[in-house]
Swiss-Prot record:
Top EC group: hydrolase
Protein name per its UniProtKB record: Putative beta-glucosidase
Organism: Schizosaccharomyces pombe (strain 972 / ATCC 24843)
EC number: 3.2.1.21
UniProt record similarity statement: Belongs to the glycosyl hydrolase 3 family.
């Protein structure tokens, strides 16, 4: 491939070959042209780990901390390192293009995919993305930055029009992409599902051609989100290079040939699209492998240490009023709560993957102390019933899981053809990429079998949701029918039915046979626009029914019996997931009641909250010690334990504002689609910029996070160097422990010709200091970017003459130093 110039290759391709290049061949591969030694390249999710090429029975992977966790580090060097390790994971799986990072904006707290994105702030988002991308590129793996643009909610994501002012579009939503383009020159970009101001982004000439290609002079490859193409000619003309996945809905080779032959589609435009795909192949040539490349296990002690470091440095200490943290390892401990023993390593949807291993909060803490910590569930926090595979035993292997036998005929047939036989360890299975040559028209049937031995006499609740059909039997007695009558879900990623449930009383120690008869998506009884070839999915759950009050009472007794409690509550991948937005900021079920109860029972309680987006904390005034963690990947529990016991000084900062209540947030009145539209009425006042403008008190401000030590900023000095503003200051560690602080630089225009935020983050720097150490820090700002607003009247950026405040602090609220500089004249500009 490298022996040929892209222009030379284009001249050697015929129209059908050019057309082939414009769409994928399957879920994860581009088309190869063997005649010219043009290889196929492999793409894969994603933003917090590399899944590989399969949803079904996928190979295990390293799960990195989610986007908000990485944003919370405010650490460019660390983010570059994240990119390097992601690249090594990609190479192990033969992946040339990683579908990430995600730089959509946390406009409101309810976005189901909010956890994937870095921040509510466009500068932090853009710079974080830049360094992850640079890390990937340093190892010859390409990033596909996403989702361009305004994919900031899941509600009606394929059809909703985001109605946004040009100024807000530029300053808030396009800016992360613009910064990443400027500083990393990413080689590919993914369009979003939604419309912007009435037109789907994947066919918007204004966004793809006028801004991205012409104004920013970007030369990369534009890729659709999966099934996010809505036209043939219009999308090609606008600049969409690659329709994914294959087989394409629109870019049929014969149709493209016909359009070119009839002069309805210009061959020169076809050439441009094909050239851009070839550029991506060329950039990826060093990592290009055959389509059947074996996906290797890349797990290592070095990787584990890196994942632990990434996770540890993202954890945010929100309260330590009584200096309870760090804890001594002496004494007795209890780990309580629904997030304690279940490792919520990732959010849901396409970001989710099968991890090499996981470490729960309970396991991480248990590994640090001499004895065994007490445990109490306290309450459930599931949306659908917990994964049944954790309770089932595979009759063949004797391990957790079940047998899954695949047939061409349903269970009612006498003579059945066995086509596959698996031992599976997950009760949530997607068949979107399952394939068997013997299958006809997408039809296959699975007999699922395992046994369950209850640990006590109790009522057990079973549930199953499907894209397909299913019957669930206990000892050959039908318990759940999700076949003859089905009810659809509103979920746009987990297609199919709601979870059908039923309960049964089971006796302790008895072996019960659990059997499910599943039919693929082709057997689904409800209408859908999805092809039966997508295979379908099932999710089987089971839980022992508990009395909520009794469970909290037990947790209280456990809390009273120990010296210290670590209380773990929060959200999960069910609540924060692609395809569905949250409806509330409150914690699930009786979580808040549990927190109140434990806080009143033991004065030495460390509350640990977990989520990828803001949550309400009605008990906050009673909690003196509070840590917030995110979906922190494989090493979640070890990272938390390092912070709790003082092996790592917390240094994470909130990349998003935590409002007190849902109704306080700027998007409260216009977050969902209303008759196909969502108006971004808060305009440029997103996140902290809104709360400061209306002087609304928040729970925790943007950029906030405590340490076990203390810092002092002093001696601010500014120098205007023309295009750059030089900022010098000193920072001292005035406390007893080594630690890191994030210096945050905000800019505020003093006299304004337009309505602007009170201040805006424009740069940041992480500094590590030993006790009593002082360092001189230099930060440089691009004055043009630091001072400009988008002038809608002139359709250009405007850096306006006048005085500007420089505000230097450790959060958006905690400003320690201020200075001023003056711009002598106004300039208008475009481009990067």
């Amino acid at each position: 491939m490298m022996e040929h110039d892209v222009e030379d290759l284009i001249n050697q391709l015929d129209i059908s070959e050019k057309a082939m290049l414009l769409s994928g061949t399957d879920l994860w591969h581009t088309a190869a042209i063997p005649r010219l030694n043009i290889p196929s390249i492999r793409l894969s999710d994603g933003p917090n780990g590399i899944r590989g090429t399969s949803f079904f029975n996928s190979s295990p992977s390293a799960c990195f901390p989610c986007g908000t966790a990485l944003g919370a580090t405010f650490d460019k060097k660390l983010l570059f390192e994240v990119g390097e390790y992601l690249a090594e994971e990609a190479k192990a799986k033969g992946v040339s293009v990683v579908l990430g990072p995600t730089v959509n904006i946390h406009r409101g707290p309810l976005n189901g995919r909010g956890f994937e994105s870095f921040s509510e702030d466009s500068t932090l988002s853009g710079l974080a993305a830049s360094y992850v991308i640079l890390g990937l590129q340093s190892k010859n793996v390409q990033a596909c930055i996403k989702h361009f643009v305004c994919n900031d909610m899941e509600d009606e994501r394929n059809s909703v029009s985001i109605d946004v002012s040009q100024r807000a579009l530029r300053e808030v939503y396009l800016m992360p992409f613009q910064l990443a383009c400027k500083y990393s020159n990413f080689k590919s970009l993914m369009t979003s599902y939604n419309k912007v101001n009435g037109e789907h982004v994947s066919q918007s000439r204004i966004l793809l051609d006028n801004i991205l290609r012409k104004e920013w002079e970007w030369k990369g490859t534009i890729i659709s989100d999966w099934f996010g193409t809505y036209s043939l000619k219009k999308a090609i003309d606008a600049g969409l290079d690659l329709e994914m996945p294959g087989k394409p809905r629109f870019r049929n080779v014969n149709t493209i040939q016909h359009l070119v032959g009839s002069k309805e589609l210009s061959e020169s435009i076809l050439d441009e699209r094909a050239k851009n795909v070839l550029k991506l192949v060329k950039h990826s040539w060093q990592n290009t492998e055959a389509e059947n490349h074996c996906e290797l296990n890349n797990d290592s002690s070095c990787l584990r240490e890196a994942l632990k470091k990434f996770a540890s440095q993202s954890i945010v200490l929100l309260k330590n009023k009584k200096k309870l943290l760090p804890l001594s390892r002496k004494g007795t401990f209890a780990v309580i709560g629904p997030n304690a023993k279940v490792c919520n390593y990732s959010g849901g949807g396409s970001a989710n993957l099968k991890p090499y291993y996981t470490v729960s909060m309970y396991d991480g803490i248990a590994a640090k102390i001499d004895g065994v910590p007490e445990y109490a569930l306290g309450c459930h926090n599931y949306l659908n019933l917990p994964n049944i595979a954790n309770l089932l035993v595979n009759p063949r292997t004797g391990k957790h899981g079940y047998v899954a036998k695949f047939y061409l005929e349903p269970a009612t047939s006498e003579n059945r053809t066995l086509i596959d036989d698996y031992d599976l360890e997950d009760g949530v299975v997607r068949f979107y990429d399952y394939c068997n040559d013997k299958m006809k028209d997408g039809y296959f049937y699975i007999d699922i079998e395992g046994y369950l031995i209850p640990d006590e006499d109790a009522v057990y609740e079973f549930g199953i949701s499907v894209f397909g059909t299913a019957l669930l039997f206990i000892d050959d007695v039908l318990l759940i029918d999700n076949k003859t009558k089905q009810t659809p879900t509103n979920h746009t990623f987990e297609f199919g039915t709601i979870e059908e449930r039923n309960s049964i009383y089971l006796k302790k120690g008895r072996k019960y046979n659990v059997r499910v008869e599943y039919g693929s998506a082709a057997t689904y009884t409800l209408s859908t626009n999805l092809s039966p070839s997508t295979g379908g999915r099932y999710s089987i759950g089971c839980v022992k029914v508990i009395d909520p009050e009794t469970e909290i009472d037990y947790a209280v007794r456990v809390a009273k019996s120990v010296d210290c409690v670590i209380l773990c509550v929060g959200l999960t991948a069910e609540w924060e997931t692609e395809g569905e937005d949250r409806k509330t900021m409150t914690l699930p079920s009786l979580s808040d009641k549990l927190v109140y109860s434990i806080l009143q029972s033991n004065p030495n309680t460390v509350v640990v909250t977990q989520s990828g987006t803001p949550i309400e904390m009605p008990w906050i005034s009673e909690a003196h010690t509070l840590l917030h963690i995110w979906y922190n990947g494989n090493e979640l529990g070890n990272a938390l334990a390092n912070i709790i016991f003082g092996e790592q000084n917390p240094c994470g900062k909130l990349p998003i504002t935590f409002p007190k209540k849902l109704k306080d947030n700027p998007a409260y009145l216009s977050f969902r689609s209303s008759r196909g539209h969502c108006v971004y009425g808060e305009d440029v006042f997103v996140g902290y910029k809104y709360y400061e403008a209306v002087e609304r008190e928040v729970l925790f401000p943007f950029g906030y996070g405590l340490s076990y030590t203390t810092f002092e900023l002093s001696n601010l000095y500014l120098k205007n160097c023309g295009e750059r503003l030089r900022i010098d200051l000193e920072i001292s560690n005035t406390g007893p422990m080594s630690g890191a602080e994030i210096i945050q630089v905000y800019i505020s225009q003093i006299v304004r010709s337009v309505n602007r935020p009170v201040k805006e983050l424009k740069e940041f720097s992480k500094v590590v200091l030993c006790p009593k150490e002082t360092k001189l820090i230099r930060i440089e700002l691009d004055i043009k970017y630091a001072t400009s607003f988008y002038d809608e009247l002139n359709e250009k950026w405007c850096s306006e003459e006048g005085e500007y405040n420089v505000l230097v602090g450790t959060s958006s609220k905690d400003i320690a130093l201020t200075g001023k500089f003056t711009l002598p004249k106004t300039i208008h500009w475009t481009g990067l």
